[in-house]
Amino acid sequence: MATTTPPETKSAAWWNYFFLYDGSKVKGEGDPTRAGICYFYPPQTLLDQQELLCGQLAGVVRCLWDLSGTPPMLIRMRNLKFAIRADGDYLWALGCGVEISDASCRQFLDQLIGFFHFYMGPVSLAYKSHPQEELSLQWDTSITQVLRSTSESHRIFNALWNLDRTKVEPLLLLKAALILQTCQRSPHVLAGCILYKGLIVNSQLLPSLTAKVLLHQTVPADQRLPGAGAAPQETGAALPPDVQITSVFLSEEEVASLHEFPVEHETRLQGSSVQYPPWDQSSPTQAEDAWASAAIPEPTPHDGACPSGSGADERLPRLEQECAGPTGLCTTACGQGSGLSSRLQKELCLSREELDSSEMHVSEAQEAFPPLPALGDLETLHSSHSAPTLPEDTAICSCLHPCPLERLPESGRLGQLADLPLTNGQTQVPGTDPLPSSMPVALPPQHPVGVEPSVEPYGNGAQESHSALPRSSRSPDSPGPSPSADRTGFKPSPSGRHAGLVPMNLYTHSVNGLVLSLLAEETLLSDTAAIEEVYHSSLASLNGLEVHLKETLPRDEASLTSSTYNFLHYDRIQSVLSANLPLVTAPQDRRFLQAVNLMHSDFALLPMLYEMTIRNASTAVYACSSPAQETYFQQLAPTARSSGFPNPQDCAFSLAGKAKQKLLKHGVNLL
């Protein structure tokens, strides 16, 4: 839901038990079970009951793990269901009521574990470096905040609390987005979010990261998580007023997501570490031609069309000084977006006679710098030519012939060749003929920091190594190392799925009820100038945004106008809810939520399901689903015909049209 947070939950009948169990402390028959209990909720449970529950569940998990090779994720009982997570010797279990869906039960457990790892790091290291009482306070704080900020509708979707955007001027939302983009230009800052009284105004983070940041903001200052805010005192950094920097830990997947979208941030980092060549200082027309030539490959003449002679020879030493890397070799700008104009590219091309001689130099250079052996059964072709030793002041450049789209190999072949080293610029591919020795050779260019090379087949077998996108912006289908994100399998090792945690900094700046939260690299804490830049670049904008939000949002949220319909809209991308349900649900609203819970479970089990209508003798609920959203609608007005049999006059058949019409004013487009 939007607009406000619910009151503190007094009773949580749906949340029965939660515990963390360390099996490494209970190995023998004489070891007491209580020695392995790291944390148990509710804490007032008798110790004998804690031992009974932890021992029985740990035994069942270990038995199923040994039989199937994978620990169970959900254990059902008569009146309870337990979501299970295993990480080496550690076992987490969350017991919920049977009315909670299986997906929500597992999501709540993952959320709790994510909170702990975000603020305390890996659980194995946390329990070695912190006292158990301090970590128990961390668990108490996380559980309290989850129960306090969870309504009946949020228990179904496990969604975040967001600001009702229909009650806020769009320019204010745009201003919040511009503030975050401005902060991204500062050093070390990756992404962030802006919150107002515990509600999301704008966020660049994943929903899981936003939920962790929300937990930090909702905890009072005197009850902050252990270790929060201790980093500035340890390093002696002087922070601006109302600013706090907390050490946090992110998974490798979350760090990769922070590097995907901020193009300006990536450009800034590369620009600070790469020296641009002098020819970038060209006229606007030449710069546009350079970008066009880099983006659209032009056909290269074959028979001596590339200019050669004194003019080209005079430019080679200059190019060697500007582009030569550690190996002293230079490549053309073919396939790179380095800003070279088409005129310079043509001047760097060699004739066929020069290519033959340069190919002999390549083999000599490879003998001086032997590459790694090729993997698999692919046979590497080595040139049999011999030539004098390559002088140090010689630059070798070559251009590849254009490859039409119809000659490109299949995508599967790309994955097989991506990890092969370049030996002579030629690699024999199974099922193809070797390239003749007179074919042009392309050498791998030098790559700036944070950019890794990728190899793609070019033509019938020649490969061109060119600059790829940064690691963070790699497409999901591209080959390369990727962190494990499997939620269904857990390896029985101490490392587990949360072992690859990366330390980061959480920068928070509070302006009354408005909070700016930024995730930055660990080096931000030691860079006082960067902290001052972030603070001063956003201070005035945050003050203005806070004043406008205070004047725009309605102050009395309790006086909600009665409506003739109920609706609930769930954004799957941002994991937020929009609804017109009251904070205190009536019996009729509970029946609506029961129907929503049932249909949401069906949508999760049947991804191809698009629409459904569920009804009883008195009312009907319409639902539609897409990969991006779920929408539920109920008409509350009494109808003349509402029998349980299909009838053209039945209200259930008109719900789809009414939902599309009435939800437009709430910003929900079902057309």
UniProtKB/Swiss-Prot annotation:
Biased composition (Polar residues): 269-286
Classification via InterPro entries: CCZ1/INTU/HSP4_longin_1, CCZ1/INTU/HSP4_longin_3, HPS4
A Pfam family of this chain: Intu_longin_1
Entry GO MF terms: guanyl-nucleotide exchange factor activity; protein dimerization activity; protein homodimerization activity; small GTPase binding
Entry keyword set: Albinism, Disease variant, Guanine-nucleotide releasing factor
Presence of the UniProt keyword Repeat in the record: no
UniProt-listed GO biological process terms: blood coagulation; intracellular transport; lysosome organization; melanocyte differentiation; melanosome assembly; platelet dense granule organization; protein stabilization; protein targeting
Region of interest: Disordered: 269-291, 417-497
Tissue: Highly expressed in heart, brain, liver and testis. Expressed at lower level in skeletal muscle.
Purpose: Component of the BLOC-3 complex, a complex that acts as a guanine exchange factor (GEF) for RAB32 and RAB38, promotes the exchange of GDP to GTP, converting them from an inactive GDP-bound form into an active GTP-bound form. The BLOC-3 complex plays an important role in the control of melanin production and melanosome biogenesis and promotes the membrane localization of RAB32 and RAB38.
Protein name, as recorded: BLOC-3 complex member HPS4
Organism: Mus musculus (Mouse)
